[in-house]
Amino acid sequence: MLAFLVIFGIIFYMNESKGKLHPVTQITNDMVRIFGDMGFSVAMGPEMETEWNNFDALNVPGDHPARDMQDTFWIKTDGKPIIDELGHSLRPVMRTHTSPVQIRYMQEFINSGKNLEDETIAIIAPGKVFRNEATDATHEAQFHQIEGLVVGKNITMGDLKGTLLEFFKRFIGPDAEIRLRPSFFPFVEPGLEVDVKVGDRFIEMLGAGLVHPNVLENAGIDSTQYSGFAFGMGIDRLVILKTGISDVRYLYQGDLRINQF
């Protein structure tokens, strides 16, 4: 049904049929709802980050290949170092993951006077991230991730496994299975790759682990008293899993045929 609106004597015809959410938005909303039901709150952060929040505070070594120009979109400056009063590099970078939200949230939590003895941090952080890499059917220069962080007293690997298993049971179905494999990420120790069983095979789905003590200390949290776990997964990958879209680039081409999903 068509309706019309008259503005300054000009008639604008409008289709009253409702629009449709993009598949990435649909899946993000589903994940936020599920994690919300599990007790997580949503935290957000800027897409343009500092070198400190994106790398240094997350225990990423100075010579780590992720910092190379061919992997990261660094923002041009006048070439002079940008350092704060604590000696942290404020060199701007388009964030390469949603993990910087961990640092920002933990610092704000401590600075606000909150106490981990009384309250456990449990957040998710969905958002867009950027990688300076060639695009193909499974890679894009921009994509979406969701970060999870829990910090408190006596947080264990069992808590991590139970949280992820419960999420996938709600997201995929009650028969969902996960498999944990040892891996390495500088911001967690130990680190894990998490595979999810889809049909008769396991698919690599996300990275996770217990928050590295250095990361907790960099955020102002005593790592001898508190522990935590973190995980990060690609939302686009879950969109492909749910919809069967064969090429991640289809999600960002503005093609209205994507509305079929």
Regions found by a protein language model. Name each.
Residues 7-11:
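Short, positively charged and aromatic/hydrophobic N-terminal segments
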